[in-house]
Amino acid sequence: MARPFFRRRKTCPFSAKDAPVIDYKDVRLLQGYLSERGKIVPSRITAVSTKKQRELAKAIKRARHIGLLPYIVK
């Protein structure tokens, strides 16, 4: 008998002990959570927790406002 499909539970990359701190000045970290068009990738794809997704979105928006990240990529 075949095993039923089992979906592995993803864990938040920011919840571990040695996890990076979400900072608006850390452009390299923030770019990993943007699509190739510059949009914020949803947490169901990146497996980021709800609390950390809000922090991440706020940091990305802050970095965009001061010019560290582009609003859109053509």
UniProtKB/Swiss-Prot annotation:
CC terms in the record's Gene Ontology section: cytosolic small ribosomal subunit
| Superkingdom | Bacteria
Q: Name one GO molecular function term.
A: structural constituent of ribosome
Name the Gene Ontology biological process terms: translation
Family annotation (InterPro entries): Ribosomal_bS18, Ribosomal_bS18_CS, Ribosomal_bS18_sf
Q: Name one Pfam family in it.
A: Ribosomal_S18
Q: Which PROSITE patterns match?
A: RIBOSOMAL_S18
Glycosyltransferase among keywords: no
User: Keywords in UniProt for this one?
Assistant: Ribonucleoprotein, Ribosomal protein, RNA-binding, rRNA-binding
Q: How does it assemble?
A: Part of the 30S ribosomal subunit. Forms a tight heterodimer with protein bS6.
Job of this protein: Binds as a heterodimer with protein bS6 to the central domain of the 16S rRNA, where it helps stabilize the platform of the 30S subunit.
The entry sums up its family as follows:
Belongs to the bacterial ribosomal protein bS18 family.
Name the UniProt record assigns to this protein: Small ribosomal subunit protein bS18
| Species | Sphingopyxis alaskensis (strain DSM 13593 / LMG 18877 / RB2256) (Sphingomonas alaskensis)
